[in-house]
Amino acid sequence: MKYRRHEAKDYSRQYMRGIWAAAATPFTPDDLAIDEAGLRRNIRHWIDDLGIDGLFIAGKQGEFFSMSLPERKRLMDIAVEETQRADLKGSGAKAKAQTIMSASDQNLDTVIELARHAEAIGADYVVVHAPTLHFHNAHDDCVLQYYEYIASKVGIGIALWSHPDNGYLLSPELCARLAEIPTVVAIKYSVPREMYARLTRLARTKIIVSTASEDEWFDNIVELGWQLYLCSSPPYTLQTSVDRRMRAYTDLAFAGKVEEARGVRDSLDPVRDAIRKTKPAGKPYAHQKYWQELLGQAGGAVRRPLLELTEAEKAATKAAFEACGLRLSDTKRAAAE
């Protein structure tokens, strides 16, 4: 690993920053196998062209729930290989982007196995979502011991993840207790803003707090002093190689150029609206993958129980995409040439 157990918090505070993206997994349309070549192209595009700082691999966006254990490990392997390429665009730089691997599972043995695999192959961190606890009316002690146990079995830095799908949310106070675990370094806190703002105040020096909402990212930099967007798909669905406005407003906000950053952030509203208005309520995965295809990325198919878009839904999405204002090519350069 790149750090020792007792260095996990300091390492993450220094390097776990910027824009991270939750990687979707492209599946081939014929046999629904992982499209490894397509995934590699996507990762190179996200890092080299879009300037994404880190990748969240094999999470919910990546459809981990429909994958075998070997498939989840394979995604991790590919991500480490691509982010640690010896020469990215001729720069000679190594590990231009970091990785956080989802070891989330209801089976604790699987969590440990995936976390150990991530550690062995050189991933930077793992993320483990809070366990689903059936019939529980109180969960704090169970969750605390759950993460303490995982941390006792692996040395890699751990990010917590609390989201409504679990049937409950971790309180800011419980998260602050969890932040005392030496290798707990961050949390993806998919909760109302007042909850993650409170946790930021309670435990800022012990845990990096973030949430997946891109709509709130700018405000969280400016008002809460956040350093990390962890994370969802907007870093690669709102941007192209010649239209990196999320990267731009993030860097401006980090530099304290708040009003300039706000203007760039607001200019993306037509893109956000196009995505929201055309996304069928029951087909978020297929919609995102089709949007990726329109961007020239490998989107691919979804696995059951997820559903594909109809031709009418694709047509509506394409029309909105073409009108949203995202630039796909450098028109000024093309005209000059």
Which ranges hold each PLM region?
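Catalytic alpha/beta core domains of metabolic enzymes, predominantly
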Residues: 149-152, 164-272, 276-280
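Conserved, mostly hydrophobic/aromatic
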Residues: 31, 46, 79, 118, ...
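Active-site beta->alpha loop and helix N-cap motifs at the rims of alpha/beta catalytic domains
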Residues: 2-167, 305-308, 331-334
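Short, intrinsically disordered/low-complexity patches at protein termini
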Residues: 58-59, 134-135, 184, 283-287, ...
